[in-house]
Amino acid sequence: MAKPARRKCKICKEWFHPAFSNQWWCCPEHGTQLALERRSKEREKAEKAAEKKRRREEQKQKDKLKIRKLALKPRSYWIKQAQQAVNAFIRERDRDLPCISCGTLTSAQWDAGHYRTTAAAPQLRFDERNIHKQCVVCNQHKSGNLVPYRVELINRIGQEAVDEIESNHNRHRWTVEECRAIKAKYQQKLKDLRNSRSEAA
């Protein structure tokens, strides 16, 4: 029977001739040491797997809790979330345009200002034609500065569209489901718009 080819001891790295095909130690002491090291590695591997499983379960519980908490959020929360997503899109859409009311190109803060307010016409809260980039002064300190807003709005979207906005009195109560869908829609629209602009640059 052919003698097994010599190999290096896993512990001391010295060459030796094994007595068995699965022998990787040159002496009993190194065999014991190798067994202990392997057992330690297996234990460490098992502990890591257990920790990974624990974290996964913990994350599942957190996700479930988050879902439950979101389910308890009032309708006003989701309206605000949807409005923030729409406003972010409007500001990006109009980023190169001046304030729709006063025409300034500089502002400490840019808002997404409604022509017909959300209180007066909640049904138009998320209508892109009714929302445009506006400087903080016109939007917050001049109550929307609506007279010049209307003039520029006609220039941008046309008289017919403005008439349609002004004659829309079909009040609508936005549901949580609608607001969630609007939030997702405008987050995606914002992402797509930014991507298209970066590709064109």
From Swiss-Prot:
Q: What are the start and end residues of every segment in region (Disordered)?
A: 36-64
Record-stated family: Belongs to the ninG family.
Origin, by domain of life? Viruses
Q: Cross-referenced Pfam families, in alphabetical order?
A: NinG (PF05766)
Output this protein's name: Protein ninG
